[in-house]
């Protein structure tokens, strides 16, 4: 044959020697993925009895959610498709937050593949759109649940609300640095956006085809939303100018400020100095917590890059003022300290070091009664011992970082606050469980 002639001159290859015991080919269990199986699944056995997901369900099942259930239109003996139970959606987002899942699409995929989420769902199918809408639509509920949970922990004696600590963290906004525009550029973009909206409206009216109309209408909606964002950015520019003028009147430095810019992606975001020393679009998340127990008492979101002057707004929103209030040096403001002193709150905040090397604990001529008491308090050994508990509140931010609260996926201050409330309530559930076990 041709093959024999082709390889006739090659040397003979040595054949593998067969062992004397003739064991043969090894037998192994290999996957067969084209087979069809019928399995009996016990959903409750998917997770262990001490699994974290059961803690969140035990918390949710005991809540009064009538304010959400009353909105459901599908009723007994009436037509209509029943929606997903609000209790289930609440539990899904609480557990997902503790696992660092902040995307509705990712959560919807996990509900199909991950045992813990499948156990929560219990055979109920969920979609990402419902999950995303629920996450942003229940801010009032989260505020109430946070307050009720803190009150329950205080009533049980697990936390002491007489001493609170405040700390802030900058969280990266969902906006790029290139989206910040000056006033002239915003005006030019607004004219272009309005012209595009008018053109698309005319095209929609002229095209009789339904499919073409839908495409044109979608393009018109996108152009209209862009025009609205540019208008919001112009309003943000006016706010920035007013804030700069107010600061210049209080503390003139003689320097000509740079021309302000606002983002067309998220007009409420501001460029702030981050923890690594860089400047990026971000929000300032303020957290008031029980000093030492890592329990969040209140949260607030603002777009001010400095913590100075943010102590009083946080104290004003607390239902009951604490006896002691611990903050870091960035919150040190004489006006806030005087106001807190008038309300019976002792502020523990390290004074800023003087450029001239003078003792910051010595009284000064323009000090009020509150500032004088604060300097004496922080200069004493007892005051320094009280202040040591403040550093524990930073563990809350570290925990949130581990849960992937590094860059926001939503835009606007209201939605950012909703996301922060999810993190705060999740933190309190886990820390409250820890405190109860340690008691």
What label would you give each PLM region?
Residues 47-94, 99:
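Basic, short loop/linker segments at the boundary and entry of helix-turn-helix/winged-helix-like folds
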Residues 1-44, 57:
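Short, flexible loop/hinge motifs at secondary-structure junctions
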Residues 114-116:
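Bromodomain acetyl-lysine reader domains
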Residues 25-35, 118-121, 201-205, 371:
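Short, compositionally biased low-complexity segments
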Residues 42, 88-94, 130, 148:
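A general alpha-helix detector
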Residues 1-14, 100-112, 124-439:
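Anion-binding and metal-coordination hotspots
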Residues 24-28, 75-79, 381-384:
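A ubiquitous short alpha-helical element
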């Amino acid at each position: 044959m041709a093959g024999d002639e082709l390889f006739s001159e090659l040397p003979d290859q040595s054949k593998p020697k067969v062992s004397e015991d003739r064991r043969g080919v090894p037998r192994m269990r290999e996957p067969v993925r084209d087979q069809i199986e019928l399995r009996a699944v016990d959903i409750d056995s998917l997770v262990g009895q001490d699994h974290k997901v059961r803690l969140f369900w035990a918390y949710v099942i005991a809540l009064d959610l009538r304010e959400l259930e009353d909105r459901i239109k599908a009723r007994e003996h009436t037509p209509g498709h029943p929606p997903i139970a609000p209790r289930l959606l609440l539990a899904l987002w609480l557990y997902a937050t503790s696992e660092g899942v902040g995307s509705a699409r990712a959560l919807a995929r996990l509900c199909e593949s991950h045992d813990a989420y499948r156990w929560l769902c219990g055979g109920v199918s969920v979609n990402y759109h419902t999950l995303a809408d629920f996450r942003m639509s229940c801010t009032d509920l989260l505020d109430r649940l946070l307050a009720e949970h803190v009150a329950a922990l205080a009533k049980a004696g697990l936390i002491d609300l007489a001493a609170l600590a405040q700390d802030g963290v900058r969280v990266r906004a969902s906006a790029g640095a290139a989206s910040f525009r000056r006033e002239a550029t915003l005006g030019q973009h607004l004219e272009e956006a309005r012209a595009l909206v008018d053109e698309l409206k005319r095209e929609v009216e002229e095209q009789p085809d339904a499919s073409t109309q839908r495409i044109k209408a979608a393009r018109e909606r996108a152009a209209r939303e862009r025009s609205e964002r540019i208008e919001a950015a112009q309003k943000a520019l006016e706010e920035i100018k007013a804030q700069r003028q107010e600061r210049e009147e209080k503390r003139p430095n003689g320097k000509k400020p740079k021309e302000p810019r606002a983002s067309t992606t998220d007009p409420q975001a501001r460029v702030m100095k981050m923890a690594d020393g860089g400047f990026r679009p971000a929000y300032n998340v303020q957290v008031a917590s029980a000093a030492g127990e890592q329990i969040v008492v209140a949260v607030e979101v603002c777009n001010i890059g400095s913590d100075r002057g943010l102590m009083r707004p946080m104290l004003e929103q607390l239902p009951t003022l604490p006896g002691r209030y611990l903050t870091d040096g960035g919150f040190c403001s004489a006006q806030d300290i005087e106001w807190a002193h008038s309300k019976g709150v002792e502020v523990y905040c390290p004074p800023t070091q003087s450029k001239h090397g003078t003792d910051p604990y010595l009284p000064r001529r323009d000090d009020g009664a509150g500032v004088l008491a604060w300097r004496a308090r922080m200069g004493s050994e007892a005051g320094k011992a009280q202040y040591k508990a403040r550093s524990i509140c930073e563990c809350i931010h570290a925990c949130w970082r581990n849960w992937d609260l590094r860059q926001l996926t939503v835009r606007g201050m209201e939605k950012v606050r909703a996301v922060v409330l999810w993190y705060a309530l999740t933190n309190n559930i886990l820390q409250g469980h820890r405190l109860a076990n340690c008691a």
